[in-house]
Amino acid sequence: MATPKAALVLMELQNDFLALEGKAYPLLKTVLEENNVVSNLNALIRGARELGMPIIHTPIEFSEDYREMGADPYGILKIVKTLGAFQRGTWGAQIADSIDRHPSDIMIENKSGIDAFCGTRLDQVLRAKGITTIVLAGQLTHLCIESTMRSAYDKGYRVLSVTDATATIGMEQYRMSVEHNWPMFSLPVTHKAFFGQAARG
């Protein structure tokens, strides 16, 4: 794989998901711990940075009144609103304190839905940099990761999804997504396998 044409796209590595005090952390706790997700994410980030890959964060944020969701949210967005999570400008919406950061990291703003391409400049940033391969990691495995994966697939990107650097609301949902859906729209790899591919070119 030609790493100069690849970017690491990180989904929602925010305190409300990854910090012990985060409002949505209890929902992800089992998968985060069982898969050693934060440690694997940081290894992935550091390795990608050493390869010269752009590191792109796509946090999700909402106004204090969650007006972006409309009058009657349902599904996962209703859960987010009920928890009071990811309010713009709060500690919970910030990139998690446990995540390796660098001033060169790119922040994609205005994501208030499931698909990181929808309503953001992600596609423009990737194409401006000549990116043809995206490496996906973060949260939630069967929601934002999978939705963004499908969009990237339709847009013609080569998509690699990192199986041990993602979490969601239970091992059953995690396994169903990674084992059955991810292979339809991406090339699933562990973070170590990804670097093995990169080393081989």
Predicted region positions:
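Short glycine/proline- and charge-enriched loop/turn segments
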Residues: 22-29, 73-81
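A short alpha/beta connector and helix-capping loop motif
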Residues: 4-6, 22-48, 52-55
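Active-site-adjacent betaalpha module
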Residues: 1-7, 16, 43-51, 68, ...
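Short beta-strand segments at enzyme active-site cores
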Residues: 53-60, 65, 162
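Short acidic, Gly/Ser-rich segments with clustered Asp/Glu that frequently serve as metal-coordination loops
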Residues: 14-20
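Serine/threonine-rich low-complexity intrinsically disordered regions
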Residues: 27, 33-36, 63, 75, ...
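Short hydrophobic beta-strand that contains or immediately precedes a catalytic carboxylate
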Residues: 9-11
